[in-house]
């Protein structure tokens, strides 16, 4: 785009626009309209993040590897469809299996795929992330930067700095930043009666039909769950929740909740932010005043949902 242009889709949906950096406001009626290519992925619902992840990986793979040369696949790695496997500088992958038959596999800078891991594309692991020994990962899955993952993962997206280091199944799910799933935590992604999954929707403040048969866990930033946690099909968890104990917790856990199947209390911001500061400091990051102010507002907005 050049100055005073915008890209639109479906006649009125603004995808992108470009104006002067000195403008305080934008008059869209004054901008020249350009039709957005139909190939551009549009996210209308939270589950679209994993639903269209395979398409996104394929598109991004072509873009990020253009005019670049992959590092050599090490001896001992078993692979299929070499042309759709790309290794960035510093990637380590001893004795694993990479199958790019169904889509590309991208291994980010300084990431590690430990021995015995089985990976099917489309798959992307971003820089400085680790796939633990013996992991089984199906497409279409993306592991964000600075993550540690293990166990069995299928068609899921991890944002940065989140961990699922141990055994347990995660499928058709979206995990935010700074999350941690305890050992042997499992997510159901299919109802026993094979019915379409309903998911909590903040806009309507109700459960809505996704039209999907497979839908797992939507977990907000800074949320943690203890060992052996079980999540039911179509569970939504807000930010800064701490879930533990036996049995299935409710399938909508509001932000700043503390507890599990036997009940919840409010996770107060003072303690929540102390933990976040410690967690982020371990990774060389800082929990800023701006972070605190934004999340205090989230705490207030989400109060109405914490009617335990």
What residue ranges belong to the model's regions?
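Membrane-embedded translocation segments of transport machinery
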Residues: 118, 124-132, 136
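Structured core of small recognition/catalytic domains
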Residues: 107, 113, 130, 140-142
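Glycine-rich hexapeptide-repeat left-handed beta-helix
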Residues: 133-134, 140, 146-308
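Active-site neighborhoods and metal-handling regions in enzymes and metal-associated proteins
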Residues: 9-13, 20, 91, 156
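Short, small-residue-biased leader/transition segments that mark boundaries at the very start
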Residues: 1-7
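Accessory, often N-terminal, substrate/partner-engagement and coupling regions
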Residues: 13-31
């Amino acid at each position: 785009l050049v100055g005073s242009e915008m890209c639109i889709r479906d006649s009125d949906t603004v995808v992108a626009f470009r104006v002067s950096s000195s403008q305080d406001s934008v008059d869209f009626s004054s901008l020249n309209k350009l039709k957005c290519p139909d190939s551009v992925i549009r996210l209308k619902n939270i589950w679209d993040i994993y639903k269209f992840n395979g398409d996104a990986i394929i598109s991004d793979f072509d873009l990020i590897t253009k005019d670049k040369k992959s590092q050599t696949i090490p001896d001992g790695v078993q692979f299929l469809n070499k042309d759709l496997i790309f290794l960035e500088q510093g990637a380590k992958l001893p004795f694993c299996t990479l199958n790019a038959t169904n889509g590309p596999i991208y291994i980010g800078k300084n990431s590690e795929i430990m021995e015995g891991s089985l990976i099917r594309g489309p798959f992307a692991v971003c820089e400085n992330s680790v796939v633990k020994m013996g992991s089984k990962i199906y497409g279409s899955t993306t592991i964000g930067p600075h993550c540690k993952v293990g166990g069995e993962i299928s068609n899921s997206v991890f944002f940065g700095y989140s961990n699922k280091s141990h055994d347990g199944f995660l499928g058709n799910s979206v995990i935010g930043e700074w999350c941690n799933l305890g050992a042997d935590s499992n997510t159901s992604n299919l109802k026993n009666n094979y019915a379409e999954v309903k998911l909590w929707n903040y806009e309507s403040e109700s459960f809505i039909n996704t039209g999907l048969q497979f839908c797992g866990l939507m977990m907000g930033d800074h949320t943690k769950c203890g060992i052996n946690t079980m999540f039911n099909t179509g569970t939504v968890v807000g930010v800064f929740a701490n879930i533990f104990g036996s049995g299935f917790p409710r399938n909508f856990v509001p932000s700043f909740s503390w507890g599990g199947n036997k009940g919840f209390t409010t996770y107060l911001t003072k303690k929540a932010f102390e933990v976040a500061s410690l967690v982020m400091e371990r990774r060389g990051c800082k929990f800023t005043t701006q972070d605190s102010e934004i999340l205090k507002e989230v705490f207030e907005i989400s109060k109405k949902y914490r009617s335990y």
